[in-house]
């Protein structure tokens, strides 16, 4: 079980940082690590909050966990970005973030469950 928790946490972090990296690249932002960390910080903090709220370690690959992690990461990240980090939260940005994070935070979980079910069926 601990193995699944580690994989889930790593994949979730990869999705969040990947979202930020792609966004920075598409907007011709400085490709340096410092800029990436500064931009990713509210969403990474949001992800940690989301994991705690969802108790994601209990069922890290579950669809309910994915949905809660997605929404909580998005909401916490946007609130932190706007009110703590004093950065923009334009409607178009919120929509893109909602779609990207929704597809990828839930998508990898869907694929993982399908593969696990397939292995279970093959072993039976």
Model-derived segments and spans:
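Membrane-helix boundary connector in multi-pass membrane proteins
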Residues: 80-96
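Membrane-water interface at the C-terminal end of transmembrane alpha helices
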Residues: 3, 7-8, 102-124
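Small-residue packing motifs within transmembrane alpha-helices
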Residues: 6-8, 42, 62, 93
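Structural signature of hydrophobic alpha-helical transmembrane segments
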Residues: 32-45
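Membrane-helix boundary elements
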Residues: 2-35
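Alpha-helical membrane-inserting segments
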Residues: 15-27, 45, 49-57, 76-80, ...
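Internal alpha-helical transmembrane segments of multi-pass membrane proteins
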Residues: 53-75, 91-98
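Membrane-interface helix caps and helix-loop-helix hairpins in membrane proteins
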Residues: 28-31, 59-60, 86-88
